[in-house]
């Protein structure tokens, strides 16, 4: 078997060769210096001078100090990449001193180098820096993935995200957009007098959502603690304390399964506004998401594609955040997407059970009418909500923290926001009646005792806070990861989390 047939042998040989070159650099006192300071980024140079002619550049006598990772070596040209883009360096074999030329011979793909010199244009019209005093800043001991194939193993892209970011411009752009999304949300809210808060990640009582928590132990306090599943109850304590507009962008943790839409550690924005209701937050959310799309993408039209196994685009859909968002109640949406049904089929237990059974939904004895309606909704409606849509009036049975509707106590003043068949946000007018909240907590405790690991705990301190009086308030949570998935046309949540959770590799 030749070396070309065994990648492991090839890589070991390359690593040995690179270690030898590093040894020579150490002997010369040139290993891992930290005394170069660039004055230009690649993309900035391309933007400012890329359209200049050779003659214009020579006349302008522009000089630059650049640094980056070697991505290609083509004869006398070296292509480097920094955080903004790429530019070429030119090795002037006649103009450089012999000692510097010898050092350049120690360069390999993946090394981090630096140089200064005049800007020129090649005969092909490419911008380059005519290197003076070329420097090897970091010797890469391991080779980069094949320049044509890249890091093709999806799982390895997640495990070795640093290589994915080096070799995959699409991945870098995804995380630039993610950063811009968070930045624009923060800007939008702070400009509207919201205060950013930080609430506990370790909690004695995990609350604010129905989910299974991660359990840990605090040795000094000698108590069991939980990684938070949501910041909600602490943020509402702040509303009680007088912070009438408050938000938090941070991680939540839920000890549940992995999927293309679920990661046990994920990022959310939660925000609360006193003297507002769920309709006010729907208006705010519509305005904010329109702003975020424009800021992050430069457009309110979000393109998503479907691809075949070869990666070819076979279908495309545009989610239009520029148009007014659709608004329907849970019941209206069920009837809209199931035209064969009537209101009489789903507004009573017998009818709803019959519909659910016909859909193959396994019923549980503890379910009431509201829970069955939601199961029908999730089975027949949720995945069909493609354009930006608010679904409102969720049953009280499945909304333990939301305020009951004044006209119909069977439902709450709650909405969820969907686009592309995905739930992105959940918001409602907050329940601020301490006695009603205590009763709902008791029902959750009963469900937990009956075996529901995701049911809520009874949070007595939160009830005490409500007894001091929380103003009429509306609150909302938006899943940052799912929002970024949508905006970047990413099929998996792992594509938008820098270091997603993975099963350990087998020995």
Swiss-Prot record:
Q: Which InterPro entries match?
A: Aa-tRNA-synt_II (IPR004364), aa-tRNA-synth_II (IPR006195), aa-tRNA-synth_II/BPL/LPL (IPR045864), Lys-tRNA-ligase_II (IPR002313), Lys-tRNA-ligase_II_N (IPR044136), Lys-tRNA-synth_II_C (IPR018149), NA-bd_OB-fold (IPR012340), NA-bd_OB_tRNA (IPR004365)
Cell compartments where the protein resides: Cytoplasm
MF-aspect GO terms:
ATP binding; lysine-tRNA ligase activity; magnesium ion binding; tRNA binding
A GO cellular-component term linked to this record: cytosol
Q: Which cofactor does it need?
A: Mg(2+)
Q: What is its EC number?
A: 6.1.1.6
Q: Which cysteines are joined by disulfide bonds?
A: none
Enzyme class label: ligase
Q: Which GO terms describe its biological process?
A: lysyl-tRNA aminoacylation
Q: Which domain of life is it from?
A: Bacteria
Q: How is the cofactor bound?
A: Binds 3 Mg(2+) ions per subunit.
Query: Which parts of the sequence bind Mg(2+) 1?
Result: 416, 423
Q: What is its main location?
A: cytoplasm
| Xref: CDD domains | LysRS_core (cd00775), LysRS_N (cd04322)
| Keyword Lipid metabolism attached | no
Q: Which UniProt keywords apply?
A: Aminoacyl-tRNA synthetase, ATP-binding, Cytoplasm, Ligase, Magnesium, Metal-binding, Nucleotide-binding, Protein biosynthesis
State the reactions this protein catalyses.
tRNA(Lys) + L-lysine + ATP = L-lysyl-tRNA(Lys) + AMP + diphosphate
Q: What assembly does the database describe for this protein?
A: Homodimer.
Indicate the family of this protein.
Belongs to the class-II aminoacyl-tRNA synthetase family.
Among NCBIfam families, the record links this protein to: lysS_bact, PRK00484.1
User: Under what name is this protein listed?
Assistant: Lysine--tRNA ligase
Native organism is Hahella chejuensis (strain KCTC 2396)
State the organism's lineage: Bacteria, Pseudomonadati, Pseudomonadota, Gammaproteobacteria, Oceanospirillales
């Amino acid at each position: 078997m030749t070396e070309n047939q065994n990648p492991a042998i090839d890589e070991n040989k390359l690593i040995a060769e690179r270690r030898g070159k590093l040894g020579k650099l150490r002997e010369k006192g040139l290993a891992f210096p930290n005394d170069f300071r660039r004055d230009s980024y690649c993309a900035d140079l391309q933007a400012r001078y890329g359209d200049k002619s050779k003659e214009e550049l020579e006349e302008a006598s522009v000089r630059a100090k650049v640094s980056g990772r070697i991505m290609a070596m083509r004869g006398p040209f070296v292509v480097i990449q920094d955080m903004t883009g790429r530019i070429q360096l030119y090795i002037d074999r006649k103009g450089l001193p012999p000692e510097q030329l010898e050092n350049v011979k120690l360069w390999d793909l993946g090394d981090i180098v630096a140089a200064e010199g005049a800007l020129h244009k090649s005969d092909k019209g490419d911008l380059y820096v005519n290197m003076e005093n070329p420097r090897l800043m970091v010797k890469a001991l391991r080779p980069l993935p094949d320049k044509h194939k890249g890091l093709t193993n999806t799982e390895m892209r997640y495990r070795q995200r640093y290589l994915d970011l080096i070799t995959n411009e699409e991945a870098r752009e995804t995380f630039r957009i993610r950063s811009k999304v968070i930045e624009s949300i923060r800007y939008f809210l702070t400009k509207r007098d919201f205060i950013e808060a930080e609430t506990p990640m370790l909690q004695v009582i995990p609350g604010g959502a129905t989910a299974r928590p991660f359990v840990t132990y605090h040795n000094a306090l000698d108590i069991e603690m939980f990684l938070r599943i949501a910041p909600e109850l602490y943020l509402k304590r702040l509303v009680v304390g007088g912070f009438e507009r408050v938000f938090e962008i941070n991680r939540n943790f839920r000890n549940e399964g992995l999927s293309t839409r679920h990661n046990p550690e994920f990022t959310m924005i939660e925000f609360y506004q006193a003297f507002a209701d769920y309709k006010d937050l729907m208006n705010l959310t519509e305005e904010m998401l329109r702003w975020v799309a424009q800021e992050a993408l430069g457009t309110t039209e979000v393109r998503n594609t479907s691809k075949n196994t070869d990666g070819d685009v076979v279908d495309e859909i545009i989610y239009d955040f520029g148009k007014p968002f659709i608004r329907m109640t849970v019941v209206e949406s069920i009837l809209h997407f199931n035209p064969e049904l009537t209101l009489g089929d789903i507004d009573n237990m017998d009818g709803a059970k019959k519909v659910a059974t016909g859909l193959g939904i396994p019923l549980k004895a503890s379910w009431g009418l509201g829970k069955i309606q939601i199961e029908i909704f999730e089975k027949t409606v949720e995945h069909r909500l493609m354009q930006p849509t608010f679904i409102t009036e969720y049953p009280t049975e499945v909304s333990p923290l939301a305020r009951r509707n004044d006209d119909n106590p069977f439902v709450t003043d709650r909405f969820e926001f969907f686009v592309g068949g995905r739930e992105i946000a959940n918001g409602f007018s907050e329940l601020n009646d301490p006695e009603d909240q205590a009763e709902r907590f008791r029902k959750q405790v009963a469900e937990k005792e009956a075996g529901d690991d995701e049911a809520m705990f009874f949070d007595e301190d939160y009830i005490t806070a409500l007894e001091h009086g929380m103003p009429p308030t509306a609150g909302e949570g938006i899943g940052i990861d799912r929002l970024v998935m949508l905006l970047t046309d990413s099929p998996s949540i792992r594509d938008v989390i820098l270091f997603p959770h993975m099963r350990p590799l087998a020995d």
